[in-house]
Regions:
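DPxDG-like acidic metal-binding loop motif
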Residues: 1-8
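An extended, acidic
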Residues: 12-137
Length: 137
């Protein structure tokens, strides 16, 4: 059966629409410019725009939280595609969506880190949420 399942039971993304009640799953970006006050402030701004934040240390497990409705959004900057590929397929199978920036599929999957946002498709979130942190806004 096509879709995302936990055992024999289908899973679906949450239907939450209130960002203040939503859970963001994320990770601390590798190569983060910790001494850059603007980047730190921008990252904190992203985190505090959600009701809850979860950092569990595994991109794929974080994406599984989105797929099962335990989290509403997963966002991370500077992550390698192989760390998220399987999780993105699970989110997609559970009815969620995702956006990638910085990876040219399929030939670019082994080269540069990318930025990803996956969600239940109920929030206005995109990879541009990291623009201020990256000094692009």
């Amino acid at each position: 059966q096509i879709g995302a399942h936990l055992g024999k039971n289908p899973v679906t993304v949450s239907d939450r629409t209130d960002r203040g009640q939503a859970t963001l799953a994320t990770g601390f970006p590798s190569r983060f410019p910790i001494s850059d006050a603007k980047a730190v402030s921008s990252f904190a701004e992203i985190l505090t725009s959600f009701g809850k934040v979860r950092m569990i240390g595994s991109a794929c497990a974080s994406l599984a939280l989105v797929a099962t409705g335990s989290a509403d959004v997963y966002a991370e900057h500077n992550i390698m595609f192989w760390d998220i590929a399987a999780g993105l397929a699970i989110v997609n199978g559970a009815g969620g969506t995702f956006e990638l920036e910085g990876v040219n599929l399929p030939e670019g999957i082994h080269s540069e880190p990318c930025t990803v946002v996956a969600s239940n498709n109920k929030f206005d979130v995109s990879v541009t949420m990291f623009d201020k942190m990256r000094g692009l806004a």
